[in-house]
């Protein structure tokens, strides 16, 4: 069976793991980081994903996309989307009722759906796994927040498809963390576990019971807009005010200054989890003013006091919903980078009367860890006793039901029902001789359907004339393990039936759209690779030219070279260097042609020099042109300098 990976697709950071040899490996990306920013950037020349995208955000804020998870599977008119848009530096537009991100890429305007942006992050995670495993990876388990509704789950699955992944299952993040935890701690009897997940952008609390390898989610609550970024914002505002006080200048209108300040604040926040104070030093932050300051942990805690305290409300709600007293919670698990903050750990511990939360699993990695275990189970990896014994029960995040007379919400599947599940109920007509019924499916907890979210609707027609209340219409809700729902209605007298799969009405991508996006993803991948080889050819030429220049300015070489040869070579090198300065965006072929031209002048001259008994005459001893490719620094080798140390080694520049 091909390997299957687990991906934690986070709002701000993502993480990937694989289950191998009875243990989980969390896989580091090409920058050596075990988590990758969920950022995608578009520039004049290329597309960047992950660290590279986040690192250049200050220079390119309007074309650097993040937080796609806040838009995925939602409608443009969704109040959440409207309020989020106010804070995004990139442009979100309405396209057929869905939010679409508009950026400038390679000089023209391009539009991407949130699914496409997320698919790019997923592709990055997949490639991270592939380069580690040395083979292709197709199967994955991807996690979503517990309160994601049906369309958000579908859209996440679509993002996986566009990334060329076969999504084995979408599972809830707390469930994944619980699996990670369940493998670490096998205990007798039923255990109540509270998962406290405070990430970069969101906050989720879930209560699970674990018994003999069976996980059940009892209840979930949270705040979609609370996380590390909010703590960063408090620091940013604090320092903007300090800058105003000290320098009488307002830097908040300058996007780049704000971005640099935010990066420094994120770093400071992380430091304050282990140190009592830290300093911030940013050169030329705004209008040439250097900003040097410091902040203590106590001040940081005070700035975020209300936010930290507010994390306790969902904890209370989860216990209330699950009808469990806090003294009955056996284990508390901390997940998400923000749970490293000592004050948060203390609040949690105090709430549970001094009980120490469990932090044995790296909080950034716990979700990917569990997803990787689940991926191994679903892909049939039964090599491990530990994966063999897990059974997973997820829950419906919101109640689902239909509208009955007078706009009343009649739930068939209650919130927190274990899924997969199937429920049927019989309804009837509201008027005499009513020829058909409109089945409208809603999700939500409110008593009236107008306050809930319409998932979809369909009609069942051809009901024979009869007095009201006589026809029997059986409505069945069937929710599968991915939380995808089939709703059907059957008129018992005639056997007439109709059904809906709750996908399209909620703005799910059509098959054609997914295929188009898949093709585009391939195209972008090819473009990314072409750009990389173009840069490599440019660096190769640059490295070769500068190496030659260094070589002929070396006094030992100087005295052995013919003056006219040296002049000829110098002119050619200068010509190449000035061409390079003016043609940074040339094609790979043009760079290679320039290199050939330079070599045609340099090689005969350098051969004479070696013929004259110059030192280091061994092929490949590091002199440009010394006996074949071994000695061309960067000739086709992406700027790698082989052999001696005469020329500078050129590294790729961001």
UniProtKB/Swiss-Prot annotation:
Question: Is ATP-binding one of the keywords UniProt gives this record?
Answer: yes
* Keywords, alphabetical: ATP-binding, Chaperone, Nucleotide-binding, Stress response
List, alphabetically, the InterPro entries matched. ATPase_NBD (IPR043129), Heat_shock_70_CS (IPR018181), HSP70_C_sf (IPR029048), HSP70_peptide-bd_sf (IPR029047), Hsp_70_fam (IPR013126)
| Annotated stretches, region: Disordered | 612-654
Biased composition of type Gly residues is found at 612-646
A GO molecular function held by the record: ATP-dependent protein folding chaperone
Recorded hits in NCBIfam families, A to Z, give:
PRK00290.1
Family membership, please give it. Answer: Belongs to the heat shock protein 70 family.
Q: What name does the UniProt record give this protein? A: Heat shock 70 kDa protein 2
UniProt source species: Paracoccidioides lutzii (strain ATCC MYA-826 / Pb01) (Paracoccidioides brasiliensis)
Source taxonomy: Eukaryota, Fungi, Dikarya, Ascomycota, Pezizomycotina
């Amino acid at each position: 069976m091909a390997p299957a990976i687990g991906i934690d697709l986070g709002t701000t950071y993502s993480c990937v793991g694989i289950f191998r040899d009875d243990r989980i490996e969390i896989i580091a990306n090409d920058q050596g980081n075990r988590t990758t920013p969920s950022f995608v950037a578009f520039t004049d020349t290329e597309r960047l994903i992950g660290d590279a995208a986040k690192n250049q955000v200050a220079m390119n804020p309007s074309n650097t996309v993040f937080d796609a998870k806040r838009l995925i599977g939602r409608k443009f008119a969704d109040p959440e989307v409207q309020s989020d848009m106010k804070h995004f530096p990139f442009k979100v537009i309405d396209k057929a009722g869905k939010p679409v991100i508009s950026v400038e890429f390679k000089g023209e305007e391009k539009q991407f759906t949130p699914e496409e942006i997320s698919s790019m992050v997923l592709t990055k995670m997949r490639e991270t796994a592939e380069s580690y495993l040395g083979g292709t990876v197709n199967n994955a388990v991807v996690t979503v927040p517990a309160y994601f509704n049906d369309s958000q789950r579908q859209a996440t699955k679509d993002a996986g498809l566009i990334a060329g992944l076969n999504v084995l299952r979408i599972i809830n993040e707390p469930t994944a963390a619980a699996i990670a935890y369940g493998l670490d701690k096998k205990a007798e009897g039923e255990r109540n576990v509270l998962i406290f997940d405070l990430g970069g952008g969101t906050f989720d609390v879930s209560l699970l019971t674990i018994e003999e390898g069976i996980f059940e989610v009892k209840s979930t609550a949270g705040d979609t807009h609370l996380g590390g970024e909010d703590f960063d914002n408090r620091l940013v505002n604090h320092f903007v005010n300090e800058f105003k006080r000290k320098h009488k200048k307002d830097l908040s209108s300058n996007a780049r200054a704000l971005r640099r300040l935010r990066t420094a604040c994120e770093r400071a926040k992380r430091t304050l989890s282990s140190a009592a104070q830290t300093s911030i030093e940013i050169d030329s932050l705004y209008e040439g003013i250097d900003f040097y300051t410091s902040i203590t942990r106590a001040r940081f805690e005070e700035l975020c006091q209300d936010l930290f305290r507010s994390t306790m409300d969902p904890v209370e709600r989860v216990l209330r919903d699950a009808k469990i007293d806090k003294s009955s919670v056996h284990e508390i698990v901390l997940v998400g980078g923000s749970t490293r903050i000592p004050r948060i750990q203390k609040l949690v511990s105090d709430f549970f009367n001094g009980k120490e939360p469990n932090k044995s699993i790296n909080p950034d990695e716990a979700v990917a860890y569990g997803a990787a275990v689940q991926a191994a189970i679903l892909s049939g990896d039964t090599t491990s006793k530990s994966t063999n014994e897990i059974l997973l029960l997820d829950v419906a995040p919101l109640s689902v039901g239909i509208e009955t007379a007078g706009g009343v919400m009649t739930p068939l599947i209650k919130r927190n029902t274990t899924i997969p599940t199937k429920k049927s109920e019989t309804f009837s007509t509201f008027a005499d001789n009513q020829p058909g019924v409109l089945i409208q499916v809603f999700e939500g907890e409110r008593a009236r359907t107008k306050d809930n979210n319409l998932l979809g609707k369909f009609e069942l027609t051809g009901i024979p004339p009869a007095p009201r209340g006589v026809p029997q219409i059986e409505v069945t809700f069937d929710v599968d393990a991915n939380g995808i729902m089939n709703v059907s209605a059957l008129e018992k007298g005639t056997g007439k039936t109709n059904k809906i799969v709750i996908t399209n009405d909620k703005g799910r991508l059509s098959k054609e759209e997914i295929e188009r996006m898949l093709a585009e993803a391939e195209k972008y991948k090819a473009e990314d690779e072409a750009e990389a080889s173009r840069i490599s050819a440019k660096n190769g030429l640059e490295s070769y030219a500068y190496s030659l220049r260094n070589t002929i300015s070396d006094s030992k070489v100087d005295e052995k070279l013919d003056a006219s040869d040296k002049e000829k070579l110098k002119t050619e090198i200068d010509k190449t260097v000035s061409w390079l300065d003016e043609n940074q965006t040339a094609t790979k072929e043009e760079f290679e042609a320039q290199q050939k031209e330079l070599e045609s002048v340099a090689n005969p001259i350098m051969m004479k020099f070696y013929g004259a008994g110059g030192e280091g005459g061994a092929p490949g001893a590091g002199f440009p042109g010394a006996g074949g490719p071994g000695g061309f620094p960067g000739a086709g080798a992406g700027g790698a300098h082989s052999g001696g140390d005469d020329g500078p080694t050129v590294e790729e520049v961001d």
